[in-house]
Amino acid sequence: MALADSDRRFFGHPLGLANLSGIELWERFSFYGMQGLLAYYIYYAVGDGGLGYSQEIAASIVGAYGGLVYASAILGGWVSDRLLGAERTLFGAAVMIMLGHLSLALVPGAIGLGIGLVLVGVGAGTLKATTSTVVGDMYRRTDDRRDAAF
């Protein structure tokens, strides 16, 4: 991403910051929206549209999902720094989140849940690690706007 000293089209910041803000907004909506509904989906009876597991198992799965998100930030940062670069990794993470949500919506039962949660979890963690790098790359280190962008 090119450094843009004179680009001030988004509240005094480069226009690319608007895109990143939107990506981050929808990723957080995805994460917290799923956190709020996931346990109900797992422990509601099959006849009610759920999977019919116990509340204890549902809580364990939700906790493991949350842990996966934050643990995968380490892997995502490594992939971004060493293999693909920040922008490609960010794009790949967004695609993983999308595929995870599609899996949760379209693949029935525990298989769809497992595939979907792994894809969304790894994608969300990777996206969290990479977004900050992309924001930092938009500014020169001496740019006064850099701190405000974060």
State each model region's role:
Residues A59-S80, K128:
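Central cavity-lining transmembrane alpha-helices of secondary-active solute carriers
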Residues T126-R140:
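Intracellular juxtamembrane helix-capping segments at the cytosolic ends
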Residues R82-A94, T142-R146:
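Cytoplasmic membrane-interface "Motif A"-like loop-to-helix N-cap segments
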Residues G92-L113:
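C-terminal ends and interior cores of transmembrane alpha-helices
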Residues G36-A59:
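Short amphipathic helix-loop junctions that connect adjacent transmembrane helices
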Residues L25, G100, I111-L127:
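Hydrophobic core of transmembrane alpha-helices in multi-pass small-molecule transporters
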Residues L17, Q55-E56, R141-F150:
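Loop-to-transmembrane helix entry/capping segments in MFS-fold secondary transporters
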Residues M1-Y32:
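Cytosolic juxtamembrane N-terminal segment immediately preceding the first transmembrane helix
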